[in-house]
Amino acid sequence: MAGGKRGGKVAPTKTFGRDYERSKGKISRDRVYDEEDIIKRNQESDSDDNSGSESGSENETKNNNNKSKLGSDSSDDEPVIVSRNPNAKKPAAKRPPTTKKQQESDSEDDSDKESDSEDEIANPNRMKQVTKKLSEINVNAKVELSRREKEELARQAATQRQNEKQQKSDLERLQVIRKQREEAAKRKEEEKKANEEKMAERRRLGLA
């Protein structure tokens, strides 16, 4: 048969490059290992794990040492103070910003205080009286009275004089009344005596 396929086995073709490496990897994966190969592989993996764990433990110990050093340094540099006093003062709260109205009211209060102090200086009567000890008071010193005190004393003296005059006039009037009563009593007695004498004369004349 001309032009037909050839019967029988096909000759293997050679592979190069990437195809060769892939085919080689497949062959190595499909390979069956003996017991000795398995034991060697296990020993190698155990040694790798041990070395990894030792390196990990060394790294952990180093990290812990570094942390402890950092903690000791921070504790030495910045000591933490815990106050157990319940009455400890708290930090003062921030004051709110003052507005224009508050500033104006504060300025008005200051001006009022200044005016009050000026009035006290100008008017000595408004000054606060200073308490003095008995030993500091001079009894013999003349006391200067104010105008109001002088007016009050003059008014009291005038009322006292008026009362004295009224009492005098009352006494004089009482004396006059007493004299009038005494004179009236004398007249009554005289009239009574005169009447009695007349009655006595009539009796004598009648009997005669």
From Swiss-Prot:
Residues 1-133, 145-208 are annotated as: Disordered. The keyword Ubl conjugation does not apply. Residues 105-121 have a biased composition (Acidic residues). Residues 52-69, 84-100 have a biased composition (Low complexity). Residues 16-44, 145-154, 162-208 have a biased composition (Basic and acidic residues). One of its GO terms (cellular component) is cytosol. Keywords: Coiled coil. Residues 137-206 form a coiled coil. The keyword Acetylation does not apply. Belongs to the PDAP1 family. This is 28 kDa heat- and acid-stable phosphoprotein homolog. It comes from Dictyostelium discoideum.
